A protein has these predicted regions:
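Phosphate/diphosphate-binding loops
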Residues: 1-41, 135-159, 164, 169, ...
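Short beta-strand micro-motifs enriched in acidic
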Residues: 4, 393-395
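Gly/Ser/Thr-rich loops at beta-strand to alpha-helix junctions
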Residues: 8-9, 95-101, 164-166, 216-218, ...
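Short acidic, glycine/serine/threonine-rich loops at helix termini
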Residues: 11-17, 38, 45, 52, ...
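Gly/Ser/Thr-enriched, mixed-charge loops and adjacent short helices
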Residues: 13-144, 148
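Cysteine protease catalytic core and zymogen-processing segment of caspase-like enzymes
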Residues: 24-25, 173-199
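Long hydrophobic segments that form regular secondary structure
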Residues: 75, 79, 84-108, 112-114, ...
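Phosphate-binding and adjacent anionic-ligand microenvironments
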Residues: 154-156, 177-179, 197-393, 400-404, ...
Length: 434
């Protein structure tokens, strides 16, 4: 069990439950635990031990420096960069008042990042996150203090959320201005670097597997297939990625990489959950290698787009607080499920994939067939051909509905215009949904 607010505000503090395989629990284990919780009617019914007794019986064990060294010993050999290149990259790091401050600086120093700077105010563990409205690397506003620390010689800002399983990145743009990278861009850069390196050394396995979620950019699958990897898609949440990776390996395949667009990444099996510490090292080395070639991450993205076409991925959230808002969100996704618009942003809706009911519908002929067979979840996918799509997913914990947009195939300016139109039309649709 890990007690954490993760990337959320302090008021959202809770805990994550992990199983023996190192990943978070999924059905039926989570349901069985809840049933046990429901049996308790009074707090006095919960058995407890004194701290001293728990220590004596071995139920309480403290993790020391040896665990840090064990982890670093596993992860450091996974580095793909050059120590000579690393020492020339200016990196600023913040753990957002969390656990990453214990390991990331050690790992980067071991890899010869001599120009590493840390945000001292955020290196101190503090569950109130006093310098941040929300310690979320998915939010560019959280990088404010790190940006204040930067000078002209700094090339990159790396951040972790407080439990250090997510990675946030800012890099210099072509005019040396700071540019925030979304989770899809970070992931595709890491994946392309890793697979390119394996290909050069002859290390690409013939049975390699990439695991992503259904809301992750289709560009990830194009990169994976270019290098000969099989793609497996899961529901959102890294617990599903871990489950799929284990199943793949049990069938004789080799799990290479897993990612979700919400800034979670994992290479191999050194852990059973997304790993922001390894990802910080990996992205820093990617940046150093590119700088040694007088390139930036944006130059590398341009090369990836030349190979696979331009891609624009975006998340759009509509919030409706309270019970009335909850009902409004329900009506909106039901309207999309039953009567989707014929077009969005000038793109014709061709197919509807209903994960909740496991039905795939051709919107031109109205013919139906079984869906992808994922666990039932209130997710709706509208496909508009050539990899363009909208995915709607109500939040399970907040009064929000999230829309994931994946557009590709045109000039970036055209894609940006389509995205703007789609967002506007969605706003109009949700107003009509009452």
């Amino acid at each position: 069990m890990i007690i954490t607010a993760s990337h959320n505000p302090p008021s959202d503090n809770g805990y994550k439950v992990y199983w023996s395989h190192g990943g978070q629990i999924i059905p039926p284990v989570d349901e069985a635990i809840i049933q046990e919780v429901k049996k308790i009617s009074r707090i006095e019914e919960i058995p407890y031990k004194e701290l001293s007794e728990a220590k004596k019986t071995g139920l309480l064990q403290y993790i020391g420096e040896e665990s840090d060294q064990y982890y670093i010993g596993l992860v450091a050999p996974m580095a793909l960069g050059s120590k000579d290149a690393n020492k020339k990259l200016g990196v600023i790091y913040s753990p957002f008042h969390g656990t990453g401050g214990r390991l990331v600086p050690k790992l980067l120093e071991l890899r010869n990042f001599e120009r590493l700077k840390t945000v001292s105010e955020q290196m101190v563990p503090n569950g109130d996150f006093p310098t941040l409205p929300s310690p979320n690397p998915e939010d560019s506003k959280a990088f404010g203090l790190a940006m204040e620390k930067a000078n002209d010689d700094d090339d990159m800002i790396l951040t972790n959320d407080p439990d250090a399983d997510r990675l946030g990145v800012m890099v210099r743009g072509k005019n040396r201005d700071w540019q925030w990278l979304n989770g899809n861009l970070i992931g595709v850069l890491l994946l392309d670097q890793m697979l390119s390196s394996l290909q050069k050394t002859g290390g690409l396995p013939p049975n390699g597997v990439l695991v992503t979620t259904i809301v992750t950019s289709p560009l990830m699958s194009k990169v994976a297939r270019f290098y000969g990897l099989e793609l497996i898609q899961t529901l959102t949440g890294f617990k599903w990625i871990r489950d799929a990776a284990l199943r793949a390996e049990q069938s004789g395949k080799q799990f290479i990489f897993g990612m979700e667009e919400s800034h979670g990444y994992l290479c191999g099996n050194h852990t059973g959950d997304k790993d922001g510490v390894w990802a910080a090292m990996a992205f820093a080395e990617l940046g150093a290698s590119l700088k040694a070639e007088e390139k930036t991450p944006f130059d590398q993205l341009d090369l990836i787009y030349q190979r696979h076409g331009n891609h624009l991925d975006s998340l759009f959230t509509i919030s409706h607080p309270g019970e009335e808002g909850k009902q409004k969100i329900f009506r909106m996704i039901e309207d999309l499920r039953q009567n989707p618009p014929s077009t969005f942003g000038g793109l014709r809706c061709l197919k509807r994939v209903d994960i909740l009911n496991n039905i795939e519908t051709d919107l031109l002929t109205r013919s139906e067939k079984p869906g992808p067979g994922l666990p039932s979840s209130n997710v709706l996918i509208l496909e508009m051909g050539k990899g363009n799509r909208i995915i709607a997913r109500p939040s399970g914990t907040e009064p929000k509905i999230k829309f994931y947009f994946n557009l590709n195939g045109d000039e970036m300016s055209v894609l940006e215009d389509k995205l703007k139109r789609i967002k506007q039309e969605l706003q109009e649709f949700q107003q009509q949904s009452g």
